[in-house]
């Protein structure tokens, strides 16, 4: 348990609140529903509350490698995965024999037993486990690992270890300094219009440098790649093309399968399982541009603290982890919860769109459809059309401006994003991006 003394100060509206709150369990009891917090002592002000706890206590590993019965050396036996994607030999798995040794199989069996017993893995164990599974490419083993991890409940250490293993084999986009991503875990089942995609375009129109990652739909009618393709954005760009789009147009999109060849091994298993796995949580951490800043939406309020601690441990310069009324993004449905993550600390604040003059809406107001339908909606909203979807884009773009330090408060971000959205400037950003992406494709 981590016990901390909380202080409050608001970056929601620029109002400075000060004072000492009572001591409380800072990480284990955090939850929120539509902006209402059940945290002891937090309700100093109905919609503007914040608390702080030490990052040292928040992210220190709960057990070290010396305590584990399953070590990285168990997986020294490895071979080239046969994954295209441009990663160097130095980034590949350690070289050894063509097939897994009996000792590594035995060790992995021991790991499976520990998961059955609901014992958490260390960060190193999780990383080594995924390296072994990618090398073996055995669907039965991958399925067992993912299901048992989900049944036990993934820890932030496990999430970080798995993310490190994935990034070892990622195709990187270099040189995008101070870029931001707006990304969600998905899995909320709401089938809304592509809010994070539209928000990314709006944030770019506001001056942010956006390096967005995404994929085609897996759980909804239209994924980010689907709607961007319908809009005319070229998806199959290499690192130089992405860099050109971001530097010249303010925004670029990295198609996950192109940049994470290891997903060719894990992807088929996930499709067959048809359940949420740790890869739903991992996605936001796997940006090939290794962005400094991110707005990360999570589909369940219980994941907010876990994701915040994982992002901090992973080395994110600053991130906002958000959840609002069952959605993996900020929305006008109601209030929500945000964790502000930096290397030094993790702070929580609640927000309510009403404080920014944004009225409530229903889920039906945000409902999307197929790629062509969603593309048409986004074009209208980016051209200046008002309504619930415009309000959603404004909220999330404002969060991106805040996390990348382009504004000082969420309220200031909302003001900037609202002015740009209503002016129709964002549609020019989209059209410019489409043009640059097509030019970049021709020069590949």
Curated annotation (Swiss-Prot):
Pfam families: Glycos_trans_3N, Glycos_transf_3. GO terms for biological process: L-tryptophan biosynthetic process. Its main location: plastid. GO terms for molecular function: anthranilate phosphoribosyltransferase activity; metal ion binding. It is found in: Plastid, Chloroplast. 5-phospho-alpha-D-ribose 1-diphosphate binds at residues 184, 187-188, 192, 194-197, 212-220, 224. Keywords: Amino-acid biosynthesis, Aromatic amino acid biosynthesis, Chloroplast, Glycosyltransferase, Magnesium, Metal-binding, Plastid, Transferase, Transit peptide, Tryptophan biosynthesis. It comes from the Eukaryota. Belongs to the anthranilate phosphoribosyltransferase family. Binds 2 magnesium ions per monomer. GO terms for cellular component: chloroplast; chloroplast envelope; chloroplast stroma; plastid. Mg(2+) 2 binds at residues 328-329. Its cofactor is Mg(2+). Anthranilate 1 binds at residues 184, 215. Mg(2+) 1 binds at residues 196, 329. The gene is PAT1. This is Anthranilate phosphoribosyltransferase, chloroplastic. It catalyses: N-(5-phospho-beta-D-ribosyl)anthranilate + diphosphate = 5-phospho-alpha-D-ribose 1-diphosphate + anthranilate. Its EC number is 2.4.2.18. InterPro entries: Anthranilate_Pribosyl_Tfrase (IPR005940), Glycosyl_Trfase_fam3 (IPR000312), Glycosyl_Trfase_fam3_N_dom (IPR017459), Glycosyl_Trfase_fam3_N_dom_sf (IPR036320), Nuc_phospho_transferase (IPR035902). NCBIfam families: trpD. Anthranilate 2 binds at residue 270. Pathway: Amino-acid biosynthesis; L-tryptophan biosynthesis; L-tryptophan from chorismate: step 2/5.
């Amino acid at each position: 348990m981590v016990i901390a003394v909380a202080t409050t100060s608001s970056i929601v509206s620029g109002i400075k609140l000060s004072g000492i709150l009572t001591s409380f369990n800072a990480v284990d009891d955090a939850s929120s529903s539509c902006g209402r917090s059940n945290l002891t002592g937090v309700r100093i002000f109905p919609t503007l509350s914040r608390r702080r706890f030490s990052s040292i206590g928040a992210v220190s590993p709960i057990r070290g490698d010396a305590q584990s019965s399953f070590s990285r050396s168990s997986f020294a036996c490895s071979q080239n995965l046969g994954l295209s994607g441009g990663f160097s030999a130095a980034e590949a798995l350690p070289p050894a024999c063509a097939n897994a040794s009996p000792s590594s199989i035995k060790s992995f069996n021991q790991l499976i037993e520990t998961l059955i017993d609901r014992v958490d893995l260390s960060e190193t164990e999780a990383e080594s486990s995924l390296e072994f599974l990618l090398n073996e490419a055995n669907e039965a083993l991958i399925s067992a690992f993912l299901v048992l991890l989900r049944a036990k409940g993934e820890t932030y250490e496990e999430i970080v270890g798995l993310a490190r293993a994935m990034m070892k084999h990622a195709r990187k986009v270099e040189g995008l300094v101070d870029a931001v991503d707006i990304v969600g875990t998905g899995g909320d089942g709401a089938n809304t219009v592509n809010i994070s995609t539209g928000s990314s375009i709006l944030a770019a129109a506001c001056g942010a440098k956006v390096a967005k990652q995404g994929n085609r739909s897996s759980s909804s009618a239209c994924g980010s790649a689907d709607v961007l393709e319908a809009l005319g954005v070229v998806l199959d760009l290499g690192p130089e093309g992405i860099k050109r789009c971001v530097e010249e147009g303010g925004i670029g999109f990295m198609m996950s399968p192109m940049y994470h060849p290891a997903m060719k091994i894990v992807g088929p298993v996930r499709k067959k399982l048809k359940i949420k796995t740790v890869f739903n949580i991992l996605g936001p951490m796997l940006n090939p541009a290794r962005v400094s800043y991110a707005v990360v939406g999570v589909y369940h309020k219980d994941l907010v603290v876990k994701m915040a601690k994982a992002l901090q441990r992973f080395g994110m310069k600053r991130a906002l982890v958000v959840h609002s009324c069952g959605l993996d993004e900020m929305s006008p449905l109601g209030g929500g919860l945000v964790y502000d993550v930096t290397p030094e600390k993790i702070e929580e604040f609640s927000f309510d769109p009403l404080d920014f003059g944004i009225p409530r809406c229903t889920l039906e107001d945000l409902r999307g459809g197929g790629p062509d339908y969603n593309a048409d909606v986004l074009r209208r909203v980016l051209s200046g059309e008002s309504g619930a979807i415009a309000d959603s884009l404004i909220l999330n773009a404002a969060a991106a401006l805040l996390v990348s330090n382009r504004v000082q408060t969420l309220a200031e971000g909302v003001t900037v994003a609202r002015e740009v959205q209503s002016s129709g400037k964002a549609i020019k950003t989209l059209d410019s991006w489409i043009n640059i992406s097509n030019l970049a494709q021709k020069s590949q």
